[in-house]
Amino acid sequence: MKKSLFFFAVSLIFAISTVTGAFAKDIIPVRPNLSQVTTIGMYQVCDDVTIYKEPDENSQILYRVRWTNDEFFPSEIGFENFFVVFLPKKNLAMVSVTDFNDDWVEIMYDNSTGATGWIKKDDPYKFMTWINFYNTYGKKYGLTLLKSSPEECNSIKSAPEETAQTISTINHPKKINLNVIRGNWALVSVLDMDRTPKTGYVRWRSDDGVRYFFPMLKECP
């Protein structure tokens, strides 16, 4: 009997630890997200956020979101629908922004539906436009080409325009360094598996706002 209780307790502890680990997994874009094309940037959120219908503390409260590294409330939204980037070991917890004013940001709080609401800024420097976000993290850690991106995203152009000459292609990149962003084009230096350096322009974002490349945040300390 005692032996049975012991094995039951061990099994229960193992099950709990397994579930907890599943909740705490890292979140980072791996494919282009069509629901986020209207977003204008990112905001680093704290672990207790009140979401309002309007940028006014007297307006309707839509949700109060709270999270730890292992749990998220409310569960009907969850980690993956709320965050664009969630890397707790690197202190990164970012949501996408659709609008802002001096004191508030409108965030997309459910990436699966595109639902939005307003949160009050607790620090004005936590908001970054997409250009600032890429200049900060993309230049420092490089870029990765998201899965399922159009084939033409592998084309390296001589100038930041569709009709420019294709001077090379991205095949099996070891590193994609971001040099500068010009509109929806990025000047990059690519080191492929054959160790051949390639420099030119790639289409990092469509005219509709779909992002094909994303900073290599896994590389940040």
Show the residue positions of the predicted features.
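Bacterial N-terminal signal peptides that target proteins for export
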Residues: 1-9
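Residue-level detector of intrinsically disordered/flexible regions characterized by low predicted structural confidence
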Residues: 4-5, 176-181, 220
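Bacterial N-terminal signal peptides
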Residues: 8-18
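Sec/Tat signal peptide C-region and signal peptidase I cleavage site
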Residues: 19-24
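Boundary regions of SH3-family modules and the immediately adjacent low-complexity/disordered segments
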Residues: 25-147, 165, 189-221
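Intrinsically disordered, low-complexity segments enriched in Gly and acidic/Ser/Thr residues
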Residues: 139-197
